[in-house]
C-alpha cells in the first residue's frame, strides 16, 4: 500500500472514531444530567465552554500545527478527548456543573484540534500525479461528508450505551477505545507532517485590518 493512502486511512479512521465519541458524549451528558434532575439551563451551561474553547482552538490551531506538525495536533486532540472522557468517570458526587464544564472544555479543544488536523492533512498525503486533483476531491469528500452521519451515529451510540451499561462505563469504554486508536495513530503517522519552514509569529494570525479582528 502506498504511503499516502496508508496515512490517509489512519487519519480518516482516527477522525471517524473521534467523531463517534464526540456525538456520544453529547448525548450521554444531556440524558444523564437530565436524569439527575439538572435544569435545562444547567444542562445548556455544561456545553458553554465546549463551544467557547472550540472557537479559540479553531482560531489558533493552524498556527500551532505549523510549528509542531499536524500529526502532533491530531494526536494531542485525541488524547485530550481521552482525558475528557476519563474525567467524567469519577464518582457522581464530583460531577458539579463547573467540573463537567471543564471536562467539556477539554473536549471542545480536542474536537477542533482533531478536525483541523484531519482536514488539513489530506492535501499533504495525496500522491502527486495525473489524477491528483480528482483523488483529493474524493478523499476530502469521504472524510468531511461522513461527519454528520458519524455524529448522528454517535448520538445513537451514546443513548444506547447509557441504557445498556450506564454513564461511567460508557465514558470509560469510549476512553479506552479512543486511547488504542490514537496510540496506533501516534505510531503510524509521519512526524512533522504540515510543519512550516518559516515559523509565523503569533500576532500574524490576526488581520492587519482592525475591523476584521473585532
Predicted regions and their residues:
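Helix-to-loop junctions at the C-terminal end of transmembrane segments
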Residues: 57-70, 162
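C-terminal ends and interior cores of transmembrane alpha-helices
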Residues: 79-94
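Symmetry-related core transmembrane helices of the 12-TM Major Facilitator Superfamily/SLC fold
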Residues: 169-187
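Residue-level signature of mid-helix packing/kink "hotspots" within the transmembrane helices
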Residues: 51-59, 151-152
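Juxtamembrane intracellular "pre-TM" segments in multi-pass secondary transporters
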Residues: 1-5, 186-214
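Hydrophobic core of transmembrane alpha-helices in multi-pass small-molecule transporters
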Residues: 16, 84, 95-114
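Cytoplasmic helix-loop-helix junction between adjacent transmembrane helices
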Residues: 103-147
Amino acid at each position: 500500500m502506498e504511503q499516502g493512502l496508508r496515512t490517509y486511512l489512519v487519519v480518516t479512521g482516527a477522525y471517524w472514531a473521534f467523531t463517534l465519541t464526540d456525538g456520544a458524549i453529547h448525548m450521554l451528558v444531556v440524558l444523564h444530567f437530565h436524569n439527575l434532575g439538572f435544569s435545562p439551563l444547567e444542562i445548556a451551561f455544561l456545553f458553554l465552554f465546549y463551544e467557547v474553547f472550540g472557537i479559540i482552538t479553531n482560531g489558533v490551531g493552524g498556527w500551532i500545527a505549523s510549528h509542531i506538525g499536524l500529526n502532533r495536533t491530531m494526536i494531542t486532540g485525541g488524547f485530550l478527548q481521552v482525558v475528557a472522557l476519563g474525567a467524567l468517570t469519577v464518582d457522581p458526587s464530583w460531577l458539579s456543573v463547573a467540573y463537567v464544564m471543564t471536562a467539556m472544555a477539554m473536549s471542545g479543544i480536542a474536537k477542533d484540534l482533531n478536525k483541523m488536523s484531519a482536514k488539513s492533512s489530506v492535501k499533504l498525503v495525496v500522491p502527486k500525479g495525473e489524477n491528483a486533483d480528482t483523488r483529493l476531491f474524493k478523499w476530502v469528500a469521504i472524510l468531511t461528508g461522513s461527519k454528520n452521519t458519524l455524529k448522528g451515529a454517535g448520538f445513537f451510540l451514546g443513548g444506547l450505551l447509557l441504557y445498556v451499561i450506564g454513564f461511567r462505563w460508557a465514558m470509560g469504554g469510549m476512553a479506552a477505545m479512543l486511547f488504542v486508536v490514537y496510540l496506533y495513530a501516534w505510531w503510524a503517522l509521519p512526524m512533522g507532517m504540515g510543519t512550516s519552514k518559516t515559523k509565523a509569529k503569533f500576532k500574524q494570525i490576526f488581520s492587519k485590518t482592525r475591523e476584521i479582528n473585532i
